[in-house]
Amino acid sequence: MNRWARWPLIILIGILGISAVVILSSLASVDYLINIWWFDSLGYGLYYWLRLLYRYIVFGAVTLLFFLIFFLNFWVASRYVGNVPPAPSKFRIAALDRYLNVVRMFRSGSLWVYTPLSLILAVIIALPIFEKWEAFLLYVAGPKTGVPDPVYGKDISYYLFSYPIYTLVQRRLLIAFVLLLVGLVALYLLERRLLARQEQPIPAGARLHLSILILLIFLIETWDYVLQRYELLYSEAHMPLFYGGGFVEMYVIWALIWLTLFFLMGTAFSMIAFIQTRKGLKPLVVFAVGFVLVLGLRYSAFLPATVEKLVVKPNEVSRERDFIVNNIKATLSAYNLNTVQTRDFTPARTAADVASPKVKAQLRNIPVWDGELLDDVYKQLQQLRTYYTFPSVDVARYTVNGMPQQVFLSVRELDYTLIPEAARNWVNEHLSYTHGYGAVMTPASQGGDEPMTWFIKGIPPESEYGFRIEQPGVYIGLGSYTYVIAPNDAGEIDYPKGNSNTMVSYKAEDGVPLSSFLRRILFAYHFGDRNLLFTTKTTPDSKILFRRNLLERIRVLTPFLLLDGDPYAVVTPGKLYWIQDAYTTSEFYPGATPTLWGRDRFNYIRNSVKIVVDAFSGKVEYYVFEPGDPIVRAYSRIYPGVFRNADQMPPELKAQVRYPQDIFEIQMNIYAKYQQTDPEVYYQQEDMWEPAKTFQDRTPVTIKPYYVTLDLIDPSRFDFLLLAPMSPKGRDNLRALALAGSDPPHYGKIIVYNFPKGELIYGPSQIYALINQDTRISEQFTLWDQVGSQVARGKMIILPISNMILYIQPVYLKSATKLKIPELKRIIMSQGQIVVMEPSLEEAYAKLQERIKLEIDRVDKRFAPLLPGSPAGR
């Protein structure tokens, strides 16, 4: 094998060697080793290696591509340097020696110069692509959706997976070839200046090389203009009316893009012809001038503004109709709202009998407790030790005594910061106080002046209603947890018992074994804690448990999933579990209006994944609940074995799955505008909605979706569902009630009950004002305040019961002393202008029923038809 034939092999081996060194040095770092051990302890060792491998495969492949682009072009250019030697008669001996040295440097030494230079440039160009390595995987693995976009007819998967990669690659290729062209032109000019050969023409091969590069640059720029056609689908020029391309974009800008392409290609071929033949300057000038003029029109605001003013504005509805329709359809599809079912709801004048079995069933599950106030009750009555806390209160439904019952549930977690200062030491923090214990559960519905009913209470957990938790330890939760070592010789405090503590030794899958002194050294370095290295309280079975916060654990495992803000606990006969909803999102759904949610911006979202985390062992499992979502299908292909089908979820967990509040809130914010599917109605925005508002402590607040158990989906059964009251934009009355089912077979089904447009349905803020105006209620509040109690009004909920719209607000009393245990005292219930306040839901409903009948009788008597013969009847 000659010297030149060996060079490609040497270069390839060199690149692979450098990549191997980078990978091995990364793996040798402490963080990588700890991650490998941690992922492996959870059963995701192969998945972690795949993520590492994919990352470096993408980086290596892209770097190699750009390296070859740079190196081969530099190498070809070096062949033409000195290809035409200078005439000896015109040069001194010194000049000839200089010429030969330069030629030798660029030819023989070029491999030593161009190889590192090409590698450096390739890495610089490839780095932004490396940061998007997972998008490349989605591009490769993304499936077809079978849904074309209405403008270009391309499958939606093109926009979700291909378009973002094409735009990124196009920009990097353009930068690479422009740098290359500048470098090669400089190289050829350098040769001519060093050798004083300006009178000699550039070699034909060099001209051909430069011509090809120029053509490639023009082709890459042409690709950019082709991609700009699709970019029009993401135009924000017409916001806030509609999103995406409008008349100006799809007719004027679209035509200018094609004209730009025409003149660009004409300029490219004219320039190459001129470089090769020194002829054809006139066509080059014509095409170049045309390109500049059209480009100016393309990016100038003059022509679009003129067309908008003279053509579009006078007939805006007709001109923009098709584009408004495209935006409506795309947005509803992107947010999974294209299958929303609408129903009419006409409120009845009279209330059904409170003795009716159906009314009783509806009242038994109305959540009258406010989660925030209930949290104070749990902490005061069930915290039991200073170091326990209840981070959040969840809404759920369970079967109690054979009947479906909506409940509130909270996990008793450990909070080390609550331990007295004198007891805070390394042993207690990392060896003894390792976990929380058990949970509490109460019914959502309860009467005032009644003692709290506890479905689950105490330590150890006990229940008179059939609930049991065999393993109540909580090592994974919502709190901020430090690392712990378990089991250990110091002993873990399992739960308090009398004046002492019951001890336990941890036995579960979670945790990285501290099986060697080297591991202790590495973990001590990682956590910056030398006590971990020198402690004598470990055993051969000791493991180190870290990343015990639920959200942190999931985000480290699957950073590509967007997490819901409300993970919730599940009680099973065996253990406590957490269920975390996760979303797949994209900001490239064509023509769909984007949403800003926290720091995330997207215009496509699916609640594709339910994540189950064992609160004791820390085991994490992923279940796909949206198998039609192309993004989660792509991830399932990329990471085989990570995602499971929903039917593989254990029945006791699947029974507790619920439709998440965050995505429903996002959907309703979108639907409030895009339920106007008629383009003319949409253009006028005459029926735009917004979430209903009320007052909380005299502060206006938006009512967020809340969970209730009602028969609104199927009249023959009660479903656990989310309810969101909607009002007309800028108004206080109600316009609709939107709901989303959580129980199979109606899971995820969204139904919107529309109220008659011509009928006033009171909104929650109006009911709030009516309550304040009720003299009997105000007098009672004043009386309670005078006896040293504080009156607290809970969140108002709106419920359709027996064809009536009821407004329910609980009233609590809190002691004015430091020890504040909220007590549910009364239930305020209203139907329109009639407001009552009674100790229980049943009593309030009965009282409301009585008041409604009296009001109907009063109105009927006052406006009864006059008797024949009366003075007014003559």
Swiss-Prot record:
Does the entry feature the keyword Transmembrane helix, yes or no? yes
Q: Which domain of life is it from?
A: Bacteria
Keywords attached to this Swiss-Prot or TrEMBL record, sorted alphabetically, are: Cell membrane, Membrane, Transmembrane, Transmembrane helix
Entry membrane topology: Multi-pass membrane protein
InterPro entries annotated for this entry? UPF0182
**Tagged with keyword Repeat:** no
Grouped into one coarse class, the protein's main location is membrane
Q: Where in the cell is it found?
A: Cell membrane
Protein family (similarity comment): Belongs to the UPF0182 family.
PANTHER family, alphabetically? Answer: UPF0182 PROTEIN SLL1060
- HAMAP family assigned to the protein according to its UniProt record, in alphabetical order: UPF0182
- What's the name of the protein? UPF0182 protein Sfum_2137
Species, as recorded:
Syntrophobacter fumaroxidans (strain DSM 10017 / MPOB)
